[in-house]
C-alpha cells in the first residue's frame, strides 16, 4: 500500500488529514485516535501506567479491607471461632498491605504471614479460607495434602497446585502470584517417627520438603494451559514468593503430645485431673500448642518455620451447630427453605428438630460437615414427592422426624 492510500484503521482518516499515522502489523492508528484512547483511560481512573508493587507488578486497585471488616465478613459465613478469625484477618491484612506498599519496608525485610489452622473436622477451616479469598477477590485454590507426592512419583506433585491456581485466573500470572492456596489435611503427611526412614517416604516428609520450597518462595515452572510436562516445551514461570499459603488439619493425637509437655505426670496428689468434657480438654490444649509439639507430631521444623501464624479452632458444641444451621447467609435451613419456596411451600424446623440434628452431628464427630447429610436424609422422601403434592402449603419438621425417622407433617390448603 502506498503512503498516500494509508488510512487509520480506527477512524478511517488518510495520512494527509492527520499529523501522524503510526504503523503496526497490518494496521495503522492516527494521533487523534491515540489522544481519544488516553482520554478514555483517564476517565476510567487509569492513565495506562501501572503503579509499581512488589516484584515490579501492577498494584491492585480498590481499598484493602481492614481486619475488622474482614472479620465482619467472615461472621456472615462462619459461626464462632472468634480468635481464629482475628488471627486470619490480621495476617491476611498484613500480607496484602506488604504487597501494596513494598517501598515502606525498604529498610526492613517483611516476611510472609503464612497460616496454619488447627482444628477438628467440620470446625470451619476450609470455609474460613474460602470466605477470605472471596472477600479479597483474589484467586483461590484448594489442595489435599494426602494426594500429593514427591516429583517423579505417580500422583500429583506439588507444582500442580500452582497449575490449578493459574487455571482459576485464566492463566494470568500476575493474578496467580497474589492468590491464596489452602492445603488441607497437612497433618496427614507427618513423618511417622522421629528418625527419618531409610526407605523412600513418597507422601510424608518428602512432600513436606517439596511444599517447603513452594511456601517459602520459588519459581515454579508450569506447563502451558495445565498440560503435562514434556521435554523441550516452554513453561510458564510463576513466582510463589507472594502467594499466601494457608495449611489446615485436624491433628488427631496432637493433644497427647501437648499434654506430655505440659504435665509432670505422677500419682496421688501429683496426678493431673482432666475435665469430664474431652472436647473442652482438647480445645484448651490446642490453644497452647507450641512449634515443638508440631515437630514431635511429625512436621519438619523448616515447614513450621514457614507457617508463623498458628490459629486454633474450637470443637463446635450443640448451640454452635444450631446457629450454623440457621444464622449464616448460606445456612442450611435457609437453603432448603428457598428450595421449598420455589414450589410455593413453606418449610419449618421446630427447635427440637434442630437440636436433634446438632446432637447427631456431634455423635458422628463430623461437626458442621455432617449437618447436610442429616437434613437431606430426613427431607429426601418429601422433596421427591413435593412437585406432585397439589395444594401443599407447609412442611413441618419435628423432633420425631430426626430421631425416629417419621415423615414430616404436611399442611394442605383447606
Curated annotation (Swiss-Prot):
Query: What cellular-component terms does GO give this entry?
Result: HslUV protease complex
Q: Mind telling me which Pfam families this protein's record contains? A: AAA_2, ClpB_D2-small, zf-C4_ClpX
Query: Any idea which positions bind Zn(2+)?
Result: 8, 11, 30, 33
Q: Where is this region: Disordered?
A: 44-65
Q: Under the GO molecular function aspect, what terms does this record hold?
A: ATP binding; ATP hydrolysis activity; ATP-dependent protein folding chaperone; protein dimerization activity; unfolded protein binding; zinc ion binding
Which residues are recorded as binding ATP? 120-127
Per the record's keyword annotation, is Nucleotide-binding included, yes or no?
Answer: yes
Q: Which SUPFAM superfamilies match?
A: Glucocorticoid receptor-like (DNA-binding domain) (SSF57716), P-loop containing nucleoside triphosphate hydrolases (SSF52540)
Write down the InterPro entries for this protein, in alphabetical order: AAA+_ATPase, ATP-dep_Clp_protease_ClpX, ATPase_AAA_core, Clp_ATPase_C, Clp_protease_ATP-bd_su_ClpX, ClpX_bact, P-loop_NTPase, Znf_CppX_C4
The record places domain ClpX-type ZB at 1-49
Keyword terms: ATP-binding, Chaperone, Metal-binding, Nucleotide-binding, Zinc
Q: Which GO terms describe its biological process?
A: cell division; proteolysis involved in protein catabolic process
The parts of the chain that form a coiled coil are none
Instruction: Spell out the HAMAP family in the cross-references.
Output: ClpX
Please describe what this protein does.
ATP-dependent specificity component of the Clp protease. It directs the protease to specific substrates. Can perform chaperone functions in the absence of ClpP.
Q: How does it assemble?
A: Component of the ClpX-ClpP complex. Forms a hexameric ring that, in the presence of ATP, binds to fourteen ClpP subunits assembled into a disk-like structure with a central cavity, resembling the structure of eukaryotic proteasomes.
State the family named in the UniProt similarity comment for this chain.
Belongs to the ClpX chaperone family.
Instruction: Write the protein's name.
Output: ATP-dependent Clp protease ATP-binding subunit ClpX
What organism is recorded for this protein? Neisseria meningitidis serogroup C / serotype 2a (strain ATCC 700532 / DSM 15464 / FAM18)
Name of encoding gene: clpX
